[in-house]
């Protein structure tokens, strides 16, 4: 070593040298940890245990889709953004997990509005990523810009716009928490294009800190005591089970409760499956197209126990005359639902599961009320849902659904579109448990059926999935049938074809002097050829004598099938409580 080199080395401070080396290593680690916003987003989704993304690409989300190319999360390519969000709803309903949707900006984002609203009405957990123009272009009418935050504010639990790439983990973690806590619902994350390409070394997020956002799940002891006092005094008890029972997966607890105290049970449309169909205490669905036994029990009871239903107008179309002789208890996780429609004697803000757990742990003796139970059961036996008059020309939709119930042993996952077929499915399919029934309740969205069946099958691939759809709703989202052979999904689509918009026509027949204004299709496509074009096996049933044999063949077929069942254009859903009438004022019995 030369003298000059020796002198230089002697002058180096070992402490500074160590600090310099540590800084160099830190900088190297920082550079190695740098990821794009899109990569961070995928990491955040994986941390939330996301299995599927339902989406449709476009310019504003190309950085995201480039990251999806690695296939760390399975992406389901819908044929329309509305199909993507309805598929996510079906997935969420059956799996109990969060449905995740990714669409581009502008028209891609506006196309998911119906599905977001549908999920908001039916309390389904979704996280929807909408693409957005790059940050510098926001507010300047850039190509495919839309103010998604303003549009979705009334139809989401929360919405976000990513303004800093470092915020992505926190926003994603919060969004999943909000979507799944309390009353579940949709959350939107607006994702500007530049946020997908900017680099960051941010860590993933584990903490939740949302000021003012608190969820009450535990019932108060005083409310439990008050409820028990009411329970002990009642002689004509009825449980009304809504979607809150199925959402909280408290079906077994409810069955235990009603059997322990011998309480006749009514469900809402979205509460079907809350207690098994064959349970002797189950009276059926209540409301507009509910059973005679259910509506009479709601009218005659002296204690109505509402568990997770929001008293919507299809159940209680005349609120001031609803359950006129009853003291009403309403248990709901959403405080805003208490006293919103029906004034109640006792409102309990709690999770239905925790409420039932608290009750089932207590030893409560009720007044002897076997006469009331027999009365309700007699009503059920004397006034069942009608199959209707025998038809020598057309198939009967009621018989079709009833027979499919037998083929599937009441264990299939059933999705529906919206219309008459939806009500027939609700009336005649023998549901056994929660998670079997996937339908659009609060919003009543035509086009929901086929895409929701795709999400349902992905959520539970080992279960038989049946989709009931009318010829009107079928033509709104039938393009999603392409996904069935593409992803190997064995879904049986049962197309109830009456050549009309059946429910609209039924109302025109009853309330508009049979003026059938634009409710009859004067031309229809060949649905069997459509099935063939999409790679789906077609079965046409246009004669009543073919019904059972053809249904057996269709359900024995290994693969997706479209089963067209032709019914009379005059077939009606009965009974019916006309809008504005009390529940006991049923017509068509």
Language model regions located:
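Glycine-rich, acidic loop regions that bind phosphate or pyrophosphate groups
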Residues: 3-9, 130-171, 271-375, 551
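Glycine-rich phosphate/diphosphate-binding loops that line cofactor/substrate pockets in enzymes
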Residues: 14-18, 38-50, 90-96, 120, ...
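Active-site diphosphate/adenylate-binding microenvironment
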Residues: 38-42, 46-47, 64-66, 377-456
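Thiamine diphosphate
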Residues: 62-135, 141-144, 293, 297-303, 308-312, 338-341, 347-349, 353-357, ...
